[in-house]
Protein backbone atom coordinates (compact mmCIF):
# COMPACT_ATOMS: atom_id res chain seq x y z
CA UNK A 1 0.00 0.00 0.00
CA UNK A 2 1.40 3.37 -1.01
CA UNK A 3 2.03 5.93 1.73
CA UNK A 4 0.58 8.75 -0.34
CA UNK A 5 -2.22 11.27 0.14
CA UNK A 6 -5.19 10.52 -2.13
CA UNK A 7 -5.95 14.20 -2.80
CA UNK A 8 -2.64 16.08 -2.87
CA UNK A 9 -0.39 13.09 -3.71
CA UNK A 10 2.07 14.00 -0.95
CA UNK A 11 4.45 11.10 -0.45
CA UNK A 12 7.56 10.13 1.52
CA UNK A 13 10.59 12.42 1.47
CA UNK A 14 14.19 11.19 1.67
CA UNK A 15 16.84 12.77 3.86
CA UNK A 16 19.82 11.94 6.02
CA UNK A 17 20.41 11.12 9.67
CA UNK A 18 23.60 13.04 10.44
CA UNK A 19 25.72 11.95 13.41
CA UNK A 20 28.14 14.07 15.40
CA UNK A 21 30.97 12.56 13.33
CA UNK A 22 29.10 13.77 10.21
CA UNK A 23 28.25 10.21 9.10
CA UNK A 24 25.15 10.15 6.93
CA UNK A 25 22.50 7.41 6.85
CA UNK A 26 19.43 7.53 4.65
CA UNK A 27 16.07 8.06 6.31
CA UNK A 28 12.49 8.40 5.10
CA UNK A 29 10.12 11.06 6.35
CA UNK A 30 6.59 9.70 5.93
CA UNK A 31 3.48 11.88 5.56
CA UNK A 32 1.02 12.00 8.46
CA UNK A 33 -1.83 10.05 6.85
CA UNK A 34 -5.34 9.81 8.30
CA UNK A 35 -8.11 7.52 7.09
CA UNK A 36 -11.36 9.41 6.43
CA UNK A 37 -14.74 8.57 4.94
CA UNK A 38 -15.83 10.77 2.06
CA UNK A 39 -19.30 10.82 0.53
CA UNK A 40 -19.43 10.55 -3.25
CA UNK A 41 -21.99 12.22 -5.53
CA UNK A 42 -24.05 9.03 -5.88
CA UNK A 43 -24.48 8.81 -2.08
CA UNK A 44 -22.00 6.02 -1.40
CA UNK A 45 -19.16 6.50 1.05
CA UNK A 46 -15.54 5.65 0.34
CA UNK A 47 -12.59 5.42 2.73
CA UNK A 48 -9.46 7.26 1.59
CA UNK A 49 -6.13 8.19 3.16
CA UNK A 50 -5.49 11.93 3.44
CA UNK A 51 -2.53 13.84 4.89
CA UNK A 52 -3.27 15.69 8.12
CA UNK A 53 -2.24 18.99 6.52
CA UNK A 54 -4.77 18.40 3.72
CA UNK A 55 -7.45 17.57 6.29
CA UNK A 56 -6.79 20.87 8.10
CA UNK A 57 -7.13 22.76 4.81
CA UNK A 58 -10.40 20.96 4.03
CA UNK A 59 -11.85 21.77 7.46
CA UNK A 60 -10.77 25.40 7.12
CA UNK A 61 -12.89 25.63 3.98
CA UNK A 62 -10.24 27.26 1.81
Swiss-Prot record:
GO cellular component terms given for this protein = ribonucleoprotein complex; ribosome
Q: Which GO terms describe its biological process?
A: translation
Cited NCBIfam families: L28
Q: Is this entry keyworded Ribonucleoprotein?
A: yes
Instruction: Report the InterPro entries cross-referenced here.
Output: Bacterial_rp_bL28, Ribosomal_bL28, Ribosomal_bL28/bL31-like_sf, Ribosomal_bL28_bact-type, Ribosomal_bL28_sf
What UniProt keywords are attached to this protein's entry? Answer: Ribonucleoprotein, Ribosomal protein
Q: What is this protein called?
A: Large ribosomal subunit protein bL28
Q: Which Pfam families match?
A: Ribosomal_L28
**Which Gene Ontology MF annotations are present?**
structural constituent of ribosome
Family per record: Belongs to the bacterial ribosomal protein bL28 family.
Amino acid sequence: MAKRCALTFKGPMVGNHVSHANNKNKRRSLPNLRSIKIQLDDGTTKRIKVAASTLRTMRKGA
